């Protein structure tokens, strides 16, 4: 969990799939908000600077891990959740299961359950992308690692290099 800022309200950023480093990906947004809010960016297992684990990744497990990470970091609710993409499901579940911990949800291109009901995921294409990344093939695709985080100009040169290393 990365934190900055000293405001009365705590914004908790939750990443979606394909976010290689939430701390760096969300920096261009939270750096604009940290003068007025306390910021907490949760890097779930397998993302960015967190550990990779071989455990079940169901919504109950992920929510439990997120809540525990915030607790261990000494960050108390209620929270304003800022979920991106598939973390929208976690945020909605959190608000339903622990309403006293969630003050509000501000979706960042947030997915909702109906989206997943209608979405048809191609498992072979998904697996191909995973294998390509694991083998380093994605390094050869021009501009793939040049995300908005890099283009926004809020990352230092060192952070850009870290981002690229984590991305690949």
Give the ranges of each region predicted by the language model:
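Conserved catalytic-core motifs of eukaryotic protein kinase domains, centered on the activation segment
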Residues: 23-25, 50-56, 117-118
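Conserved hydrolase catalytic core segment
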Residues: 77-120
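Active-site loop/oxyanion-hole signature of alpha/beta-hydrolase fold enzymes
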Residues: 41-82, 98
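Conserved HGGG/HGGXW glycine-rich cap/lid loop of the alpha/beta-hydrolase fold
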Residues: 3-49
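Stable alpha-helical elements in mature extracytoplasmic
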Residues: 25, 29, 62-66, 87
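Active-site acidic short loop of glycosyltransferases
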Residues: 6-8, 35, 75-77, 99-100
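Flexible "cap/lid" subdomain of the alpha/beta-hydrolase fold that forms the substrate-access gate
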Residues: 104-168
């Amino acid at each position: 969990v990365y934190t900055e800022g000293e405001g009365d309200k705590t914004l908790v950023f939750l990443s979606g799939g394909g976010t290689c480093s939430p701390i760096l990906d969300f920096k261009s947004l939270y750096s604009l908000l940290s003068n007025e809010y306390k910021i907490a960016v949760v890097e779930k297992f397998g993302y960015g600077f967190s550990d990779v684990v071989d455990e079940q990744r169901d919504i109950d497990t992920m929510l439990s891990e997120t809540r525990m990470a915030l607790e261990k970091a000494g960050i108390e609710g209620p929270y304003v959740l800022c979920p991106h993409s598939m973390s929208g499901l976690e945020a909605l579940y959190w608000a339903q299961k622990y309403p006293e911990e969630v003050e509000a949800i501000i979706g960042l291109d947030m997915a909702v359950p109906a989206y997943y009901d209608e979405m048809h995921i191609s498992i072979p294409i998904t697996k191909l992308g995973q294998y390509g990344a694991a083998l380093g093939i994605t390094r050869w695709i021009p501009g793939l690692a040049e995300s908005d985080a890099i283009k926004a100009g809020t990352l230092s040169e060192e952070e850009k290099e870290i981002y690229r290393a984590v991305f690949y």
